[in-house]
Amino acid sequence: MSPEDPQETQPLLRSPGARAPGGRRVFLATFAAALGPLSFGFALGYSSPAIPSLRRTAPPALRLGDTAASWFGAVVTLGAAAGGVLGGWLLDRAGRKLSLLLCTVPFVTGFAVITAARDVWMLLGGRLLTGLACGVASLVAPVYISEIAYPAVRGLLGSCVQLMVVTGILLAYVAGWVLEWRWLAVLGCVPPTLMLLLMCYMPETPRFLLTQHQYQEAMAALRFLWGSEEGWEEPPVGAEHQGFQLAMLRRPGVHKPLIIGICLMVFQQLSGVNAIMFYANTIFEEAKFKDSSLASVTVGIIQVLFTAVAALIMDRAGRKLLLALSGVIMVFSMSAFGTYFKLTQSGPSNSSHVGLLVPISAEPADVHLGLAWLAVGSMCLFIAGFAVGWGPIPWLLMSEIFPLHIKGVATGVCVLTNWFMAFLVTKEFNSIMEILRPYGAFWLTAAFCILSVLFTLTFVPETKGRTLEQITAHFEGR
């Protein structure tokens, strides 16, 4: 079939009668690409141990006040939003592999700037650079992994993206116990450097190579990743070079997955995960933990364990079931969390956001301690529920549902939406709590979780066991 053929299909990489692939190098390539999300997670988790270290040991020019500390944590999301746009542009022009290689530059440069910082502006500049790299990695890594994986393991390998993110966060928390902020930034250079070295030996995805009409290179990549090219057919790729045009939004195969992808990112951030993470230390303090920093590590361990569980069962249980189950768990946990605040806080709504988590009820100490444990239990349940579904699956589905020729633009829009919502929710959550009181704010997030369950059951298709071509055909009504 010639490149001018208007037929719109993605590369059909396996004929119906062919044997299932058995190559193991696909797991090595996944690990190499997933070092990007590991770096991304480390950059996100870096601020939690670094801010106390900067306030404790840094010279006067580097001391962070409340405003600077707030921006030190939040500026990553702004850089990541820009990185999402940049990643979407790079994805279709530079390719998946080169985009991953390029994102190592701002990762290493950003941490190097932080290490050499002489004033607060250098700290913020370094964080902005690492945020830019986070945006690119969060977009490109899921796409690369989904395009090299065969259907039987695509859920497992795709879930490794979120697993590596939470592992990176946990690594930053644990390392922060023994390393001060400069050496912690030096450690942050290690994962992207390792990714740079490993990705040099990994192939470009066969799908991208086929869109460039590099048939021999695509077959070589298949042999490297899957062990054999037996049964592979030369695909029709004519329409893949059209690129994205606004007129395409009229086609159901384009606007349906785009709407679903955007909504998944919006609901992920409206679940309240950032609010829970922000208040983890305070909740553990009220439960009488001697070392409140233990909260961060405990939360990180729960995230890693349950994200690993999700990865192991993803290709058996399916995406839709896990998303719905995750949403139900978050509804109950957020409702219980709001109930905790309702029982421990009363009186007129005239407190500032600084004191929102200070109990002002007249309950006896032992009663309040019991309620604090209700909060700890609710928080841990929420984190487990989020990790099983709404943590990894939106990123996995983002990499699965878009046609190949719009993947760069569509994933860029989704990543931009996710990071913009993360910034908006983090920045405005205190204002919402001042208006609705803490219990009202958390009950509102429970309502959003209910909507996410209804959305999942109504609109999200099951992609378990389907090829990417079958998923595209589903949206096109074929």
UniProtKB/Swiss-Prot annotation:
The chain crosses the membrane at residues 26-46, 71-91, 97-117, 128-148, 157-177, 183-203, 258-278, 294-314, 321-341, 369-389, 406-426, 440-460. GO terms for cellular component: cytoplasmic vesicle membrane; membrane; plasma membrane; synaptic vesicle. InterPro entries: MFS_dom, MFS_sugar_transport-like, MFS_trans_sf, MFS_Trehalose_Transporter, Sugar/inositol_transpt, Sugar_transporter_CS. Glycans are attached at N350. Residues 47-70, 118-127, 178-182, 279-293, 342-368, 427-439 are extracellular. It comes from Rattus norvegicus (Rat). Residues 1-25, 92-96, 149-156, 204-257, 315-320, 390-405, 461-478 are cytoplasmic. It is found in: Cell membrane; Cytoplasmic vesicle membrane. This is Solute carrier family 2, facilitated glucose transporter member 8. Pfam families: Sugar_tr. Highly expressed in adult and pubertal testis, but not prepubertal testis. Moderate expression in hypothalamus, cerebellum, brainstem, hippocampus, and adrenal gland. Lower amounts present in most other tissues. Its main location: membrane. Keywords: Cell membrane, Cytoplasmic vesicle, Glycoprotein, Membrane, Sugar transport, Transmembrane, Transmembrane helix, Transport. It catalyses: D-glucose(out) = D-glucose(in); D-fructose(out) = D-fructose(in); L-dehydroascorbate(out) = L-dehydroascorbate(in); alpha,alpha-trehalose(in) = alpha,alpha-trehalose(out). It is a multi-pass membrane protein. Interacts with AP2B1. GO terms for biological process: D-glucose transmembrane transport; dehydroascorbic acid transport; fructose transmembrane transport; insulin receptor signaling pathway; male meiosis I; response to hypoxia. Insulin-regulated facilitative hexose transporter that mediates the transport of glucose and fructose. Facilitates hepatic influx of dietary trehalose, which in turn inhibits glucose and fructose influx triggering a starvation signal and hepatic autophagy through activation of AMPK and ULK1. Also able to mediate the transport of dehydroascorbate. It comes from the Eukaryota. Inhibited by cytochalasin B. D-glucose binds at Q162, Q268, Q269, N274, W395. Belongs to the major facilitator superfamily. Sugar transporter (TC 2.A.1.1) family. Glucose transporter subfamily.
